[in-house]
Structures are given as C-alpha cells and as structure tokens.
C-alpha cells in the first residue's frame, strides 16, 4: 500500500551527542556497505559546537538531517515530536528507531532483513557504559561485555536484555514502517511532560497493533550505549522536572487503566476513508464523537492521491453534493489522527478508474484484512463505547464481525457496510478478496458493498455463494445486530432530521447502541449539512436528533 525507496530507515533524535554520533555513523559505514538504507537525524536544536552540518557530508550513504529551531522547541525536553518528524520522512520499508549514542555491534540490519515480520517489534539488547573511560575501553575491546571484572566496575551494564532487563525500549528497535504509520509514531501528548513516551509506544504496539514484542539476545547483535552528560534537564529545577515526570506518568497510567478496563480481542485502530470532496461538520463528528467515548485508539484516515471524479453507477445513490464549508483540515489538529494519501496503483485492485465509492468498498476490506481494527464510515456519530458493547454482545473467539438487521417485509437480513470489526488476515476477508473480481460491476453503486455481502452471506443464496464460502473458516465469523449503529434505518430519516420527539438520550443510554448512522448519501442528510449554521444552533434549541447530537460538540 505504501511505496518505499529503501529497505531501512534508521531514525534518531539528536541533541548534543556529536562525539557519540560520530562513532555510530562510522560503524554504519564500516558494517552496512551492501545495504540499501538511509539515516534520518532530527537535531533538537543542539548547541553550535554539536552542529552536524559538516559532519554528515563525510558519509557516502544518504543522511537526511532535519533541524528543529529554538522557537519550535521552546522548553520541551521530551523527544516524542522529534522522532515523529523523522518517522514522517522515513522512506524505508523497515524503520530502526534508536538513540544516536547507540553504536551497533554485529550485523543488526542483516538480522532484521531475514527475521523481522509484519507481526514483530524487535528491540536489540543495549549495553550501557557509565563513564567516558568505560566507553573508550569497551569500544577498543568489545569482548569486555563478557568480562566479570569490567561488568562489576561498570554496573548497571544492560539497559535492555532479554533476561536481565527486558524493558524492550528503543535504544535500538525496529518495526515495519507500515505498522509505524498506523500508530503515527509516539503519542505527542507526552511532549508536554517528561519520560514515559517509550512506555506508551510499547503499550500502543501491543494494544493497538497486536504485535509480538521481544528483546533479542546479544548473540544476534547488540548496541553499546555510549556515555554522555545528561544536560537536557538542566533548564528546570528538580521540582519542575519532577512535576513534568509526574504529568506523563499520570497520562500513561490513565492509558494503562483504560485498556485494562476495556480489553478487546481486536486491534484498537479506527480506519476511515475520504474521497477528497468537501468534508462537512457532521463528517468531522465521526472522529470527535469517537474520541469522546474512547481513549488510546489510533485513528487512520485514508485519502486517494488522485481521486476519480466520475460516478459510474446508473442509479441515483450519492448524486447530491455537499457544498458547504470544508472541515477536513480540522482533522490535522487531532493528535491521534493519521492522514494517509494512497496511490491505488500500489494496491492489488486492477480497476484503477473505478469510482471512489466502489474503490472505498474494496479498500475497506483490504485495509481491515491487512491491519485489523474497526472500519467506520464517515457518517456515524458515536454515542457510546465500542469496546464496552462488544464485551457484552460478542460470544466466542471471533475474528470478523459483520452487522446485519432483519428486513421483516422481505423476511431476510440486510447487511449494511458502514461498520466492520476484524482481526488481520482472517479467512472471511481473505476469502472475499480472493473472489473480488466476480462482483465488480461499475454500473452498480453497491457492487462491492451491500450487494456483494447480501450475495455471500444470505442463506437463500447459499448454493451460489458456496464457492466463496468454502474459502472461509465460518467459525471465525460473528453476526451482530446492526441496531448498534443503525437505530434508525434508511427509511426512517425523519426520526433524525425532522421529528423533535426523538431525543439523544434514547441512543446514549441504550446498551444495544453505540452510534447513529446518519446516511451521508441521502438527500435529507445533504440538505441538513448544506444548511447547518453552527452559530445559530449554538444559541438556539435543537429541533431534531441530529441537532442535539451536533450541539454537544460546538
């Protein structure tokens, strides 16, 4: 899905470590001549004597030096935003996250190339030197790491080690760039305090991505953490610095507590797709409302680099346009939102000229199968907690959840496609994707959406769908009641847009409901969005359910 120029990006945040970094860069040159890699150094406003402008010119491998100004840095000492600047520039398939003072011993890139998978986070063992003399002696004779006398004098020796101290921190660690993009890097809330950013990213790697975290044995290679003076904290008094630590500790502890109380068998990733058209305030409410009821989730918004403007289908769905204010840039202000611009030429979907609605229907299946998590349309206002709902409503170990409701007049189920929840690489989505070409029809608005799901999963059509179903392990599939996000159906729009008797409390207190799907493609919805006056609504009484839900956020 993402295209990369290098096999590896080695990303490091840097502040006043010039002698140590020189050793690190020299070792790269000595060890990794055969590898396709780049080094990204983000200089967090170092002093003049530690400037790297001339140093980086002395290496024949690509070094991207990014410098942070004094104004941009301010009084911040936490490096989370520093590393994130580097991550956004990383063009390697694998990202190595490390401190500049950590020098490699052994062929670390070779081990990663042969062993790191899409479900892995590897942290290399890190041997610490407690003085400049210990550093000099060890760099001259690396075998001293196994010398009991040297270790007794150097104590504490291992900052990271699979048995002695398995903290898994990123003294030198690696993961696939695809996975790092889904996290968005470090949580920048931690930039306001001190410490605990490394704890949070490990929590996110586990809870949000579901990766296997491990610290590798020194036998496969390790890093030496070269001694350096700790001068970053000197701008604060001891009391001030302690307060910054406590601030981040409270933030981290809050995340841990939330995830312990809201455990979920699916990755905590929310995926959304937007086609580049005008983005209404109601669309924005999908993210604002989700964040009101959820903590510690990562939200990924995917947009096409070159959206197709034509609408190939011959029916009347989604023909009306929203022409009001574009609120899309508001998403950039939300720290847990990552926006990705996708080139469909890099995806295994041959119909590159397909209409955006149809491409988005393919894309939701592809992304959900690749990463797992919750797929949501951009026309759901969340009114409660998704994790809480699924804890009480899902029975058994399910890997894919589809939501449906009974159409009583026709005596069959309707399967809408506004919401899916899945684990990555489940057999349900894999089976559908293997057969996707059977269902593509540019004349049909829902050819890869509701129409396809109705064909596959309604029992009346079992014999026709059997070749597709046989590709699946149906025990992985759970069918949930779509009432949870569709308390009003497509033919009940008046209950949302016109009926003043329908109140928000009815959907906020219902244990079987966690959201309201407001049907962005409907004419009533477009009319509402085009005529919404936030200032007027803020100072007046709501006239309908959607008014009441919107007013909670203005």
Language-model segments: residues:
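Short aromatic/hydrophobic "clamp" motif used to bind/position activated sugar donors
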Residues: 95, 373-375
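A conserved acidic beta->alpha catalytic loop
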Residues: 43-54, 102-103, 305-309
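Conserved catalytic core of nucleotide-sugar-dependent glycosyltransferases
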Residues: 87-88, 105-189, 390-450
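Glycosyltransferase-associated regions of secretory-pathway enzymes
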Residues: 253, 260-360, 378-554
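A conserved hydrophobic helix/loop-capping motif in glycosyltransferases and polysaccharide synthases
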Residues: 8-20, 24, 31-32, 42, ...
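Glycine-rich, basic loop-to-helix element that forms the pyrophosphate-binding segment
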Residues: 71-90, 358-364
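Short, acidic, metal-binding catalytic loop of nucleotide-sugar glycosyltransferases
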Residues: 26-36, 289-296
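Acidic donor-binding loop at a coil-to-helix junction in glycosyltransferase catalytic cores
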Residues: 192-200, 360
């Amino acid at each position: 899905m993402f295209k990369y120029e290098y096999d590896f990006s080695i990303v490091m945040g840097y502040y006043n470590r010039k002698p140590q970094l020189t050793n690190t860069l020299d070792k790269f040159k000595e060890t990794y001549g055969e590898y396709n890699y780049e080094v990204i150094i983000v200089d967090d406003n170092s002093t003049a004597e530690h400037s790297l402008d001339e140093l980086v010119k002395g290496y024949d491998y690509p070094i991207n030096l990014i410098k942070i100004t004094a104004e941009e840095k301010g009084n911040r000492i936490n490096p989370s935003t520093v590393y994130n600047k580097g991550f956004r520039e990383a063009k390697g398939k694998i990202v190595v996250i490390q401190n500049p003072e950590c020098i490699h011993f052994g062929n670390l890139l070779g081990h990663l190339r042969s062993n790191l998978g899409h479900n892995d986070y590897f942290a290399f063992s890190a041997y610490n030197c407690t003085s400049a003399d210990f550093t000099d002696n060890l760099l001259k004779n690396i075998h001293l790491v196994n010398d009991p006398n040297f270790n007794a004098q150097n104590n504490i020796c291992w900052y990271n080690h699979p048995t002695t101290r398995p903290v898994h921190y990123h003294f030198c660690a690696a993961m696939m760039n695809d996975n790092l993009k889904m996290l968005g890097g470090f949580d920048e809330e931690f930039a306001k305090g001190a410490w605990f950013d490394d704890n949070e990213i490990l929590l996110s790697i586990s809870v949000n991505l579901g990766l296997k975290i491990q610290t590798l044995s020194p036998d496969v290679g390790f890093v030496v953490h070269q001694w350096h003076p700790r001068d970053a904290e000197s701008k604060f008094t001891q009391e001030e610095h302690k307060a910054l630590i406590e601030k981040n500790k409270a933030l981290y502890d809050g995340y841990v507590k939330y995830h312990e109380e809201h455990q979920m068998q699916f990755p905590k990733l929310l995926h959304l797709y937007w086609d580049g058209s005008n983005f209404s305030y109601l669309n924005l409410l999908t993210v604002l409302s989700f964040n009101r009821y959820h903590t510690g989730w990562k939200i990924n918004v995917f947009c096409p680099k070159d959206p197709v403007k034509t609408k190939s289908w011959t029916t009347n769905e989604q023909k009306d346009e929203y022409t009001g204010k574009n609120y899309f840039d508001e998403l950039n202000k939300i720290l847990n939102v990552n926006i990705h611009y996708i080139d469909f030429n890099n995806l295994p979907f041959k119909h590159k000229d397909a209409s955006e609605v149809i491409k988005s229907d393919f894309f939701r299946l592809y992304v959900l199968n690749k990463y797992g998590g919750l797929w949501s349309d951009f026309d759901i206002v969340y009114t409660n907690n998704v994790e809480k709902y699924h804890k009480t409503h899902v029975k058994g170990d399910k890997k894919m959840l589809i939501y449906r409701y009974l159409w009583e007049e026709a005596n069959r189920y309707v399967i809408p496609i506004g919401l899916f929840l899945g684990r990555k690489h489940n057999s349900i989505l894999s089976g559908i994707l293997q057969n996707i070409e059977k269902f593509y029809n540019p004349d049909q608005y829902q050819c890869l959406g509701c129409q396809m799901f109705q064909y596959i999963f309604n029992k009346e059509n079992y014999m026709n769908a059997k070749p597709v179903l046989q590709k699946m392990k149906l025990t992985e599939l759970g069918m949930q009641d779509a009432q949870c996000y569709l308390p009003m159906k497509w033919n009940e729009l008046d209950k949302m847009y016109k009926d003043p008797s329908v109140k928000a409390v009815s959907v906020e207190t219902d244990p079987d409901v966690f959201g309201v799907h407001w049907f962005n493609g409907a004419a009533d919805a477009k009319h509402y969005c085009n005529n919404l006056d936030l200032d007027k609504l803020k100072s007046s009484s709501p006239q309908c359910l959607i008014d009441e839900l919107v007013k909670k956020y203005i």
